[in-house]
């Protein structure tokens, strides 16, 4: 490291060492403010910024009937989410990126944070930090990075960022059918004295250009989890999945076959594209309660002012048909659920979206010993989102 950069780093560390989040900001500042002798070389590779802010009001009925204590009253809460990322090309091959986000550092499924707690300050952490290499059709990444697989929220919540190493290769040569192969080594839990937990996953995807108005995408994946310990898992990580009698390990292994089909049709005009997404997953590591599936229909888009989009979705997941630690957290049930989703998006002005999402859901199976009716829960969300 050059002397000027070292001096700058010492100064920033001295100023910001009083609080962990300030250290994160100082690290970003180190990349944002190059020394004079470096500035000219970096002009061709500027630092790129992106981010978004969302505010939400949420109402949930019948929170947890049958729990101890029995909670049947509705809950109203207000939630915010803030994300701010940077990325920069280091040279012709490598790209560095990082992102700050609100939310609990102990919960990989969400960047939301509930307002309240006697007006305490919001928690912000580094939810992405990665290095990428792109060479022709080959893509490599390492660190904590966005999920490179084609997914739905059945198995993967949209806020989950993988940590470890990933690679993909896009095969060229055909304009009609474009295959893509993706692989990931996903580090879940590293321990000094106990066995590590990790996932090895691969996906083969085919993008098929059927006609000028119709595209079809098919993706098949296999995710092989090895989870030896739940010592560092939180209660939200294991909700709904079967555990051993002592509660210290999963009862099942998690080895998923996941198949996704997406149809994009543009025959109704530019403003009203239609998308249909179907997902089916089977856990080969479970003896029973091992399947999950979902279907979503979208009409419209949210690209510019006065655009709108509507969505209807249906999903069903058995207890070990998903891994609750990384599947969706849109409702109070992460597995063993049946769910209907209705969503409406409207672009008020450029980069500003209003959204209404309604969930109606219940447990797929309910133990008779609980002596409770398996009635539907409801959750209504009103969102305002700004991108910048």
Report residues per predicted region.
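Cleavable N-terminal export/targeting peptides
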Residues: 1-44
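C-terminal hydrophobic structural anchor segments
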Residues: 306-359
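Short conserved micro-motifs at the rims of enzyme active sites and ligand-binding pockets
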Residues: 231, 322-325, 367
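Extracytoplasmic loops and strand-loop junctions of Gram-negative outer membrane beta-barrel proteins
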Residues: 64-70, 111-114, 149-150, 188, ...
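Short, conserved acidic/polar surface loops in the N-terminal third of protein domains
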Residues: 108-112, 143, 151-156
């Amino acid at each position: 490291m050059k002397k000027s950069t070292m001096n700058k780093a010492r100064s920033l560390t001295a100023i910001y060492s009083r609080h962990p989040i300030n250290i994160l900001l100082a690290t970003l500042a180190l990349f944002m403010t190059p020394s004079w002798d470096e500035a000219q070389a970096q002009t061709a590779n500027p630092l790129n910024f992106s981010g978004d802010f969302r505010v939400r009001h949420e109402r949930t009925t019948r929170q947890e009937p049958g729990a101890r204590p029995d909670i049947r009253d509705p809950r109203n809460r207000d939630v915010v989410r803030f994300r701010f990322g940077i990325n920069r090309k280091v040279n012709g091959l490598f790209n560095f990126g990082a992102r700050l986000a609100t939310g609990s550092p102990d919960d990989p499924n969400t960047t939301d944070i509930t307002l309240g707690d006697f007006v305490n300050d919001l928690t912000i952490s580094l939810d992405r930090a990665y290095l990428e290499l792109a060479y022709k059709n080959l893509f490599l990444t390492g660190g904590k990075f966005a999920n490179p697989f084609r997914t739905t929220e059945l198995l993967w919540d949209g806020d989950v960022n993988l940590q470890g190493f990933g690679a993909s290769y896009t095969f060229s040569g055909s304009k009609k059918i474009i295959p893509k192969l993706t692989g990931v080594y996903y580090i879940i839990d590293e321990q000094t004295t106990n066995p590590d937990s990790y996932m090895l996953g691969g996906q083969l995807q085919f993008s098929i250009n059927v006609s000028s108005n119709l595209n079809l995408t098919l993706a098949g994946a296999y995710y092989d989890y090895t989870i030896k310990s739940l010592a560092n898992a939180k209660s939200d990580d294991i909700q709904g999945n079967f555990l051993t009698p002592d509660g210290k390990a999963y009862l099942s292994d998690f080895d998923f076959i996941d198949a996704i089909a997406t149809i994009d049709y543009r025959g109704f005009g530019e403003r009203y594209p239609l998308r249909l997404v179907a997902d089916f997953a089977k856990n080969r590591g479970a003896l029973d309660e091992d399947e999950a599936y979902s279907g979503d229909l979208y009409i419209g888009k949210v690209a510019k002012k006065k655009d709108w989009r509507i969505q209807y979705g249906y999903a069903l997941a058995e207890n070990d048909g998903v891994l609750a630690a990384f599947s969706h957290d849109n409702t109070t049930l992460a597995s063993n659920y049946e769910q209907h989703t209705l969503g409406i998006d409207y672009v008020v002005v450029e980069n500003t979206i209003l959204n209404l999402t309604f969930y109606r859901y219940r447990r797929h199976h309910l133990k008779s010993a609980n002596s409770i009716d398996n009635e539907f829960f409801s959750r209504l969300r009103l969102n305002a989102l700004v991108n910048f």
